[in-house]
Amino acid sequence: MINWESNQTQLALKEIQSAVQMYGRGSRVVRLAYCYRRLRNLVYYGVQQQLQNCFCHPHLDSSKLHILLHLRGGLGDCASYRVCILALREKLPNAVFHYYTDSPHAAEVLFEADEKNVLLPSGKIPYRRAYDMACELCISFKTVYVNHARIQQLAPDFLPVLTLSLSRQKKLSFFLQDNYLLDDALGRFLYWQGAEKLEAQRYLSALDFDVAQTGSLPDSILKKDVSGYGLKKPYITLHSGIDATFNMKGSTPLKCWPKENWSTFVKLFREKFPHIQIVQLGGENSPKFDFVDVCLVGKSSLQDLPALLAGSTLHIDGESGLVQLTRWLPTRAVVLFANTAASLFALPKNINLTSDKCGACMWLEGPSWHTRCMLGYSSCQNMQTYTPEYVLEIVSRHLAA
């Protein structure tokens, strides 16, 4: 756990801020570019919110608190945010939570729509000031609007937590003022501190939760009928790909195991476990394997994934959204870590394979870190260390347990 108040931590954060601002010290053009970005964001989102106020202003029951939660990132990100959200739910048991996700339908995989949970459609961000509190969750936790009078009226016991949260957010205001840009820098800070990804959310939200928490999804999600896919138990699931909303531009993600390795692994696995069906899952950014028993790439809905994974004897994957989803499933995963750090993303319940042949380059150079090696290699050197024979040995050991 990070001691956020220590002088060492404060200096480390100041170092990042100084590095980000470095080129601006001697260049008026760079300083103007930063100002332009802040002004553009202010105007763009301000106009967008005003339009939402005019045309899509929600009518909410004034007898209850209404909390807007904007969950940024892909399915895996949203799955991890559920830890923070459950902690917030404990503090506000009677509030109505409204979920808006950047990744379409992600909330439907994680939350059951009822009188206390409203799943909003994708599209434009709802008008934030229509709610009593609006928060953005990514690596950070940012309160973008709060109606203090309403909180005082309907949830006075929450005020100390809110006050502490806002004071902490003020201390990290440099990162939060443009969190779309600087969340990556905050993520790198967590990495070098040896912390887990949710550590910043825990601090900024002032919610006391276990960053390694696991649990279960609602039965209506977990036990959904997926018999129509014709799967026969026992089966294992494979996945190779990243968030479907990411534009791959024909590239292969560095965090994905090469197709030839998958092919060899499946051949060896089938020889050793002929009675276990091999099922491939995936979305638009996943290649289709013709050597598996059942390929559901592009054929299964996002909403069916929890039930499909829950029925699996074992899931095998790179670090991905499906792996993060196992936090809330009975299924364990064998995870091949490549260019993302296990210290940040690994779940203790899973079998996490790591390599020190190279480092972890996540969040460097913007989105290109997904597909382009900064050191010029054609593929991730960490991922190259996992041979099909080695992975089969790990999988066999788990299946025999």
Walk through the language-model features, giving the residues of each.
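Catalytic machinery of carbohydrate-active enzymes
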Residues: 2-401
